From Swiss-Prot:
Residues 31-44 have a biased composition (Basic residues). It comes from the Bacteria. Residues 24-44 are annotated as: Disordered. One of its GO terms (cellular component) is ribonucleoprotein complex. Gene3D superfamilies: 1.10.287.3980. Belongs to the bacterial ribosomal protein bL34 family. One of its GO terms (molecular function) is structural constituent of ribosome. This is Large ribosomal subunit protein bL34. GO terms for biological process: translation. Keywords: Ribonucleoprotein, Ribosomal protein. It holds the Pfam family Ribosomal_L34. The gene is rpmH.
């Protein structure tokens, strides 16, 4: 059985990156929440 986590920098960026977050209203809400909480890193 292969491992479930097969890292790919490109897929990671496309799904969880800053531009992906900014592309949707919900994604912008995620960023706003993380800014309000004072997260050091907003996205991956």
């Amino acid at each position: 059985m292969k491992r479930t986590f097969q890292p790919s920098e490109l897929k990671r960026k496309r799904v969880h990156g800053f531009r992906a977050r900014m592309a949707t209203k919900a994604g912008r809400q995620v960023l706003a929440r993380r800014r309000a909480k004072g997260r050091h890193s907003l996205t991956v």
